[in-house]
Amino acid sequence: MKLKCLLVDDEPPALKVLAHHLSNINGTEIMGQCKNALEALDVLNSKPVDLIFLDIHLPKLKGMAFLKTLSDPPAVIITTAYHQYAIEGFDLN
């Protein structure tokens, strides 16, 4: 069984790096690459996802605000350079 991953980041280079590394890990499958939280919500509503790689600073709806809207979120890995957001993300999931 593969770990189904969703990548959410508004920076194309960050998405590319994450996708590249995940493609080299056996047992993972990328279910989508999204530039904002609204695109991610569409994927979550249409495909099974086990793990989200979520950037904090997103257009339209910030990563933490998006995470708070999910009633039963999959596991989440926060991708940020700001430790205070990482701690808040850990507390939410």
Q: Can you say where each PLM-predicted feature lies in the sequence?
A:
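Two-component/phosphorelay signaling modules centered on CheY-like receiver
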Residues: 12-32
